[in-house]
Amino acid sequence: MEQIGKVFRQLRESRNISLRQATGGQFSPSMLSRFETGQSELSVEKFLFALENISASVEEILFLARGFQYDTDSELRKEITDVLDPKNIAPLEDLYRREYQKHAHSQNKQKHILNAVIIKSYMKSMDERVELTAEEGKVLHDYLFSTEIWGIYELNLFSVSSPFLSVPLFTRYVREMVRKSDFLMEMSGNRNLFHTILLNGFLASIECEEFTNAYYFKRVIEEHFYKENETYFRTVYLWAEGLLDSKQGRVKEGQKKMEDAVRIFEMLGCNKSAEYYRNTTDC
């Protein structure tokens, strides 16, 4: 907490905000001063109130307090990105093995197995034969189903591991996700992941002609429908609706929706998306 107090002071002073302004009259400036110098701690409620008054976020404070280092999850993503080579899976395999070497000497074995699952998801994008071990599948299931509130970590973990799941199992996980992620849905990162997962499930269900699951995803999407500035999601959803119509015999209506979606991408200058969806449906 001493380091956090020091960082808080640096941010406050850099923005020319006094101790009194930072407390907003809700607690004494001397209390905040003692927190900044490491002489005492501050309650979470007071700390969050003061953060808001200096226009800072918890993420900024933690990033600075770690000495401009990201958290371990961000570090893992960086390690993966650094070795990622679409033509060579070996560096990812080495990273995967190293995670299990850490697992052997760690008290938090679950964390290293979940890290291994994340690494393996990138391996699967290069080699479809890659699958989770029975232990990895169990740890993934137990973690997600025992966590009562899904935040950005859980949504990301589920999203990257989805290629390992059948459509029925994916749908079961999504039912859990919907129940457990509403609390944090308005955070932009969470919302984007949430909608990406739903769209992926909707499309996968349609392509496999599992229409009961497809209509479940359609209902959940419409219950959490996209804001006006979420144009990409809206357009892909329009295209997916067209695919569903076509698969169920409403070919003319479906083709029109898919062609409309491609035209929207073209008008917005999203040429790669337009080309992808045009080629997928031969519009």
Stretches found by the model and what they are:
Residues M1-S14:
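A short, Lys/Arg-rich alpha-helix, primarily the initiator
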Residues N16-S33:
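Short alpha-helical DNA-recognition segment
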